[in-house]
């Protein structure tokens, strides 16, 4: 199977438990507080357009997701850039084209909303994720540098 029986659709508030479960399987850690904030922003804020997607099997089981944001901007005018901040594919379904299908649908959805650029942050030591984004035509930004300060 190369993602062929997988349907990509907009994320719904009812997907919370499945998304948190997939993330926990991927990271071997639970982050419900992170997803509480993400879902709050996604489904209750009027400042962001729906952009997050899920990958769903024919039986309704979620096997992956991608979350991003498109800020509406001042006076309801959307920005030409969006962010991709979280992506996850259930480890039992990896290497089947689901991540690529999610990224492609995410890109097409944003393109239809007038987005010209997608930004994301990746740990430079995460070679798997770096390879995934590189193979999906993401490249290091020429204009933005992530700065940090240890405290």
Protein language model regions, located:
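Acetyl-CoA-dependent GNAT
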Residues: 10-14, 21, 25-79, 85, ...
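Conserved active-site alpha-helix within GNAT-family acetyltransferase domains
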Residues: 100, 112, 124-142
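Conserved acetyl-CoA-binding loop-helix of GNAT-fold acetyltransferases
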Residues: 89, 95-108, 135
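Hydrophobic adenine-recognition pocket in adenosine-nucleotide-binding enzymes
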Residues: 11, 87-89, 122
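Short hydrophobic/aromatic beta-strand or adjacent loop that forms the aromatic wall/cage
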Residues: 50, 142-146
């Amino acid at each position: 199977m190369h993602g062929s029986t997988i349907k990509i659709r907009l994320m719904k508030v009812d997907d919370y438990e499945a998304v948190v479960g997939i993330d926990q399987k991927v990271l071997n850690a639970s982050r419900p507080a992170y997803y509480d904030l993400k879902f709050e922003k996604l489904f209750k804020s009027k400042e962001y357009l729906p952009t997050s997607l899920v990958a769903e099997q024919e039986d309704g089981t979620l096997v992956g997701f991608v979350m991003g944001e498109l800020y509406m901007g001042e006076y309801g005018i959307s920005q030409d850039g969006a962010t991709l901040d979280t992506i996850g594919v259930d480890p039992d379904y990896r290497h089947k084209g689901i991540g690529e299908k999610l990224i492609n649908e995410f890109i097409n959805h944003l393109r239809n909303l007038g987005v010209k650029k997608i930004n994301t942050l990746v740990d430079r030591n995460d070679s798997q994720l770096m390879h995934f984004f590189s193979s999906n035509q993401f490249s290091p930004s020429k204009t933005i540098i992530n700065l940090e300060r240890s405290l």
